[in-house]
Amino acid sequence: MNIKPEEITSIIRQQIENFNTNIETIDSGTIIQIGDGIARVYGLEDCMEGELIEFPNDVYGMALNLEQDNVGCVLLGAEEGIKEGNVVKRTKKVVEVPVGEALVGRVVNSLGMPIDGKGPVLTTETRDVEVPAPGVIDRQSVKEPLQTGIKAIDSMIPIGKGQRELIIGDRQTGKTAIAMDTILNQKGKDVICIYVAIGQKQSTVAHIVNDLTKMGAMDYTIVVSSTASDSAPLQYLAPYAGCSMGEYFMHKGKDVLIVYDDLSKHAVAYRTMSLLLRRPPGREAYPGDVFYLHSRLLERSARLSEKLGGGSLTALPIVETLAGDVTAYIPTNVISITDGQIFLESELFNAGQRPAVNAGISVSRVGGNAQIKAMKQVAGTLRLELAQYRELAAFSQFGSDLDKESVKRLEKGKRLVEILKQPQYGPMPVEKEIIILYAAVNNHLIDIPVNKIKEFEKELFNYIDTHYRDIGKDILEHKQLTDELKSKLDKAINDFKNVFLSEI
């Protein structure tokens, strides 16, 4: 290539004019120790708590321990190929996850990356994983019901939008089943559901996703999965990531339901991380801030004020107990953070009462305001009558003669217990719950044999749907049982009862 001498001078002049003196500075550090998913890094002077740190091989870490001479980082990926002496860089960003409508119907990991084989999540919006909870002024009181479709819960332990209701019980007592039924019951109610699986078996998560897909619930559900094979840092991040995804919809004025399954495994993952970071252990070897770990997560559930759009985030955290011991560290912590608890007992479960809700020690501290008036009218005495029945049942085991009133109460109690039984994946619309509870509480079932109650319930709904279709509509419209509606209900139940008893 021949360049003329006069061209050379113009090229040099051009280069000098376009010469860029910008210097790019990168905050970097050196790994001085690595192992067990923890890296100690020297030289990151102005690092933030919770900042993303870039490691070799496209692996990111999170700065958790800011010490005088080094920074303790947890790795959010595989540590293979990363060794002492490697250079790491600051990103000057905290951990964030993708949010938006594109996530609905997807299964993602703790960092929002898809793991369902359906291609990338097409969204440009992200949100920090750790966000401060809304303040007192930004909230309004819980006053709208969130129906679970489970008779025992909607009647005695009602949940409102924006509430945090703990589901607590031993393993294999139906905790996840209650959460799943609640998700299924939100179909067609414009509620976004998020199921966060923490430390579960991969087969269990696959089974849940399969069931949700089969029932058509994945159309409004996001599944965030951090299974038992994931590292402790990823399990630790999962609920915060799910919460951020839910907050996006809450700030858009929508109602969101989020299930954390379960926070016991979350605390164990955090304990693992803390001990590896050499933080001092406390009770049951958990670190001192394990209460704050869960309180800052659950406080993010709220019903926002109308000024902020009036959206809500309702949380159903799940905690597993050992041999029914609710006085252990994590259960007592979460009980004191939440607005009530649904306590499930293995004795009731094994006795065939499913859902195995112990109505005696289960409470809802704020949901009563959210209950519709019609449900309050039928369920007002339910808890008391069940408690009296249990007491009488225990007393009658001694074989002593009971007076007529006590026998009547026992018979009514047996039917109430039978009515509160419900199969899994069978959530019930609120108007049907009210109809059958009205029948049970007002002694309409006293002459129906206990073993025929389930059959009676099923056929009663069919009868009312055929002959008294307007009853359900009236309940939903007025949200209370007027005298006219009560007499209509009494007539419908008595008409059907005469037909039913004549066929037995």
Curated annotation (Swiss-Prot):
Enzyme kind, highest EC tier: translocase
Reaction(s) the record says it catalyses: ATP + H2O + 4 H(+)(in) = ADP + phosphate + 5 H(+)(out)
EC number: 7.1.2.2
InterPro entries: ATP_synth_asu-like_sf, ATP_synth_asu_C, ATP_synth_asu_C_sf, ATP_synth_F1_a_nt-bd_dom, ATP_synth_F1_asu, ATPase_a/bsu_AS, ATPase_F1/V1/A1_a/bsu_N, ATPase_F1/V1/A1_a/bsu_N_sf
Gene Ontology CC terms: plasma membrane; proton-transporting ATP synthase complex
Membrane topology qualifier: Peripheral membrane protein
GO molecular function, one term: proton-transporting ATP synthase activity, rotational mechanism
Keyword field: ATP synthesis, ATP-binding, Cell membrane, CF(1), Hydrogen ion transport, Ion transport, Membrane, Nucleotide-binding, Translocase, Transport
Residues with site note (Required for activity): 362
Chain sites annotated for binding ATP: 169-176
Compartment annotation: Cell membrane
Domain of life: Bacteria
PANTHER family, per database record: ATP SYNTHASE SUBUNIT ALPHA, MITOCHONDRIAL
Family membership: Belongs to the ATPase alpha/beta chains family.
Function: Produces ATP from ADP in the presence of a proton gradient across the membrane. The alpha chain is a regulatory subunit.
Stated name of the protein: ATP synthase subunit alpha
Native source species: Clostridium botulinum (strain Okra / Type B1)
Organism ancestry: Bacteria, Bacillati, Bacillota, Clostridia, Eubacteriales
Gene from which the chain derives: atpA
